[in-house]
A protein has these predicted regions:
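Gram-negative bacterial Sec-dependent N-terminal signal peptides
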Residues: 1-17
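Cleaved targeting-peptide boundary
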Residues: 19-25
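N-terminal, post-cleavage mature segments of outer-membrane
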Residues: 26, 46-50, 57
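Short glycine/threonine-rich beta-strand-turn micro-motifs
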Residues: 29-34, 52, 62-122, 136-173
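Structural boundary/hinge residues at secondary-structure and domain interfaces
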Residues: 35-39
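Structural signature for extended repeat/solenoid scaffolds and their inter-repeat hinge/linker regions
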Residues: 41-45
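Long, folded non-catalytic interaction modules
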Residues: 124-129
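Short, intrinsically disordered, charge-balanced linker/junction segments flanking boundaries
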Residues: 177-180
Length: 180
């Protein structure tokens, strides 16, 4: 009876391992197809993605209040790009991430020169939203693009001469000199 139980446990754990391994392989294939990279690069990218949190926490702390955006580039290789408000020497870093079994270098590009931090952008979003609400009643989305610093307010409506005049008026009232 013990042998049957041990064999059953061994078989079920083997099936679980095979299923989880199959899921990992499917993730690698999907990433490879989505981003147009080979499976080795996809495997590396997924590993870095899974182990990046502590590195991002350290970057957030180092540049506290000055980060304009953080985003991922997948081509030609996986890397994290950090846009920083103000001036400085752009730099490339490799931060070791991983676990007890495996480690890898997480490439991070620090790019200076952003005009506003995320916090300032949120304030500008609120200001823009108030102005837009005065002219349009059908706001669809409000967003901040961390890659380029653009603030976008989308409204439902047609591009009529009247609506385009409203947009020009809103931009004039908004008067944000830090727009990209």
């Amino acid at each position: 009876m013990k042998k049957i139980l041990a064999l059953t446990i061994l078989i079920s754990s083997s099936c679980t391992f095979a299923a989880s391994n199959e899921g990992i392989e499917q993730g690698i294939r999907s990433y490879s197809l989505l981003h147009g990279v080979n499976t080795a690069e996809a495997n590396k990218a997924l590993f870095l993605e899974a182990n990046r949190d502590s590195a991002l926490d350290a970057i957030e702390e180092e540049f506290k209040g000055r980060i304009a955006g953080i985003y991922i580039e997948n081509l030609p290789t996986y890397k994290i790009v950090v846009r920083v408000k103000g001036y400085g020497q752009n730099e490339k870093r490799n931060i070791v991430v991983g676990n007890a079994i495996s480690k890898g270098d997480l490439p991070i590009d620090i790019q200076y020169g952003a005009k506003e931090s995320r916090e300032e952008a949120i304030s500008q979003i609120n200001k823009a939203l108030k102005l837009v609400k005065n002219s349009f009643y059908t706001i669809q989305t409000v967003s901040y693009n961390e890659k380029n610093g653009n603030i976008v307010v989308e409204v439902k409506g047609k591009s009529t001469v009247e609506n385009l005049k409203k947009v020009d008026e809103i931009q004039s009232l908004w008067n944000n000199p830090n727009l990209p």
